[in-house]
């Protein structure tokens, strides 16, 4: 394919390795960073941090360094924006968690995008601008789109990389997540990435992509807490943790798979809820540092309460009676032990004083209604 003119507004620990990778694939890469120190280091081929493979590419790169954003905009068809969205040091995981919470700081990102918008106003074309930075869902719509020219071609394309292996992760991703409403922009970026790898290209809305990025990161955190819970149980009960995790890792059908990743009711049946409660008892017996299993059951109850409230408020707003479908703990069975549907029915009984009917041809003879209802 014809080499593309690609720019990077930000040449830090994320932007520079990715820029070097595209340069190495033969694209014409332009880079600009507001830090004079960063620009000087790159010009002198100095990488002040360890990033596997990047120094070798920096030594032989043919990237053009732009000394203002106007020069960057004038030369590029695609501009990546890997500008940091920092957090207060209190929220970076090196100190104890407090009651306070905070969103990321978007000031640097907003300033960079606003600058690009200003520079583009003098052009007769609008390059595709691709934000890479991590943001929370709704941020781009709320914080950025309102200040931009309507012709501004904005996309969101966060990377799933880890510092230290940025170059390798960029070249060998699991997938490319791309949020945009611009069909042409998506096709151009898909063509660009095809010169680097053959990873699947997942296109969605910007807001969806914003959540997917942080959902991915926090899912990893959840796995680590679970694994460390197993480690602590094993340490305190004389069990081999490697044997436990090695066996669980073989469960590629239900555990290490997309199964159970769709939203819906909580888990049920004769094993899951009772096992969590039994393991919570064991956590207390062993004096675990954290009762992961109690958290699971509390989450199950809170989410069931939320679903019950959603059903009842929808019922009240529509002036239609609520009606539940499915009493068993899962489809195609008549077993009701541990059923989250029964838990929800009981919560509605407690909270609203309503004995809500449930139709399930496998468990009862409650007929399917003929009149309009709010079904759940």
Q: Where in this protein do the model-derived segments appear?
A:
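Structural/interface elements that position substrates and couple domains in central-metabolism enzymes
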Residues: 2-376
